[in-house]
Amino acid sequence: MHQGLTLSRHTNEYAGTDKLRLAVAAAIDAIAAASIDISELIGRGPLAGITGEAQGSSNADGDVQKDLDVRCDEMILAGLQKIPYAALASEESETLVLGDPGAPISVAFDPLDGSSNIDTNMTVGTIFSIVPNKQGEAPFSAPGNVQLAAGFVVYGPQTSLVLTLGNGVDIFTLDRRDRTYKCIRQQVQIPEHTAEFAINASNHRHWEQPVRDFVEECLAGADGPRSKDFNMRWIGSLVAEAYRILTRGGIFLYPGDSRPGYGDGRLRLLYECHPMAFIIEQAGGGASTGRERVLDLAAKSIHQRAPLIMGSVDKVQRIELLHNDPAAATITAPLFGHRGLFRV
């Protein structure tokens, strides 16, 4: 652990004199600076006029916007206006913010993930993805495997920034005394054998059969096919779920399901699934839709959705197998069925 390593030193050493890397570093530094102000704003809560009440408008994806969503979006946009960019994509904006078409990078971000948790004083965060700009190609039209950097900020008991520059994952925690991010962990690797899974089990009746099969294998415990007792987690905040996986292992599932509008889940590909998949893979994990690698997907629209299953490689591979080979299922009696453990 290198507690003397600050985020700014880390990005400076990464950038050197390379034009593309300098632009990436500038974007990271701008988002980090905005996140410090966002952390202070969230920390003051109602004292700063922060509530979970809806503003009355909706974002491009149809979610009701809260005042804090808009304020965080404005703070990050203000920081990014100071750097060279070709395009910006925000969850809160229906269209792209266009900059210099000759700039080396474009940035996609979710300014405040999990904002519905604000009223309950739970974890929220910021997610971002930085991609190269190729002249002659539409911004953000390439698959996720072209990302140059990705990260997320967790506004929890501590404010921490998780970052990959394509060579592993490092975690920095905000030192509020001098408003700097300092490294607490380098080259994070996801633990392989943690018996935890995270999914919103209330949607069981809407899931595809492979997802049901996987969850039922976990719930069968030590006497079931996985031969161990699993714990279930669900926070409702993607950044919190991802941080737990990085530090403790396990698997997170937000699959598509049969509800209208949920065929591809609820998470957005560009600024949620792509950056999280990049981070998780760089930490030795896997990220899939259940059928294919998330980083192989290219977005056809800036707010396109995709299922996201991420975590320890063995668990991600297991659910991919269940999708691709239904005969691999080892449990036929549904734990949630008429004769199951969750009978009503």
UniProtKB/Swiss-Prot annotation:
Binding site for Mg(2+) 1: E91, D110, L112
Pathway stated in the Swiss-Prot or TrEMBL entry: Carbohydrate biosynthesis; Calvin cycle
Subcellular location: Cytoplasm
Amino acids binding substrate: D113, G114, S115, S116, N200
Enzyme class label: hydrolase
Transmembrane segments: none
Gene Ontology biological process terms in this record: fructose 1,6-bisphosphate metabolic process; fructose 6-phosphate metabolic process; fructose metabolic process; gluconeogenesis; reductive pentose-phosphate cycle; sucrose biosynthetic process
GO molecular function: fructose 1,6-bisphosphate 1-phosphatase activity; magnesium ion binding
Annotated Gene3D superfamilies: 3.40.190.80, Fructose-1,6-Bisphosphatase, subunit A, domain 1
Assembly: Homotetramer.
Annotated family: Belongs to the FBPase class 1 family.
Protein's UniProt name: Fructose-1,6-bisphosphatase class 1
Organism of provenance: Rhodopseudomonas palustris (strain BisB18)
Recorded name of the encoding gene: fbp
